[in-house]
Amino acid sequence: MMGDSVIYYVEQADEPVNRADERARKTFKYFWRELFWERRRIISALDFAMVKVPFFQDGEDGEICEHMWIDDIYFDGLYIYGVLNNEPGELTNVEQGESVCVPVDDISDWMFVCNGIPYGGFTIQAMRGQMTEEERTEHDAAWGIDFGDPGQILLVYEEKEHPENLEEHPMCRNCIDDFRQQLSQNSDYLREQDEDGYTPLHHEAIAGNALMVQAMLEYGANPASTTSEGYTALDFACLTGWQNVADLLEPRH
């Protein structure tokens, strides 16, 4: 897996990497959905999951920026929380192992690895696309991962074999009947709110679990419930880009 030395300093004027940054931000929802379900698994399926974010510090010759990876990720629909995985090269205002919080729109990449297969890694593939074959081999050996064709980036598990996994996570499809059965016996928990005002409906909407959201609504979940900052489940579905979830939560007239 990644070592502390595997840090890449990227010029912000690098157009392929800038495009990769944007793709990572637009598709982050798939990363969080996978991590959401990973936490429900009895046996972990992921080798690791990380998000790359930029860190800044004023230097003698101007601003210094290092793009580094964080893990132990949590996402509340607005902010990403994690722990810095890398040892900074030049920065002195942040340390490896330090807890960090960044707006989701600030990320520059995401990646998870399942059974040795990488998903995401947009900036990695952008940089690999500019390398020679020998350089790519050395790069992949440093990570301990075969990143394959730089032009092919997977977003979800078994995407090629099951493109429907883009729309709904396979674990969601597999457990929805049991979930409905549980709700039919006791749906009281749907009205619970955590210390920040999030309900179960908020969390499922952020993760893009349309089948779960639909079942919750049928069993009395209140789509008008707001977090302490005033966000509804619909707000989060729109912010994260889950249109199929937003369609379920739109008020009916």
Curated annotation (Swiss-Prot):
Disulfide bonds: none annotated. InterPro entries: Ankyrin_rpt (IPR002110), Ankyrin_rpt-contain_sf (IPR036770), DUF2314 (IPR018756). Pfam families: Ank_2, DUF2314. Gene3D superfamilies: Ankyrin repeat-containing domain. ANK repeats lie at residues 196-225, 229-252. Keywords: ANK repeat, Repeat. This is Putative ankyrin repeat protein NMB1133/NMB1171.
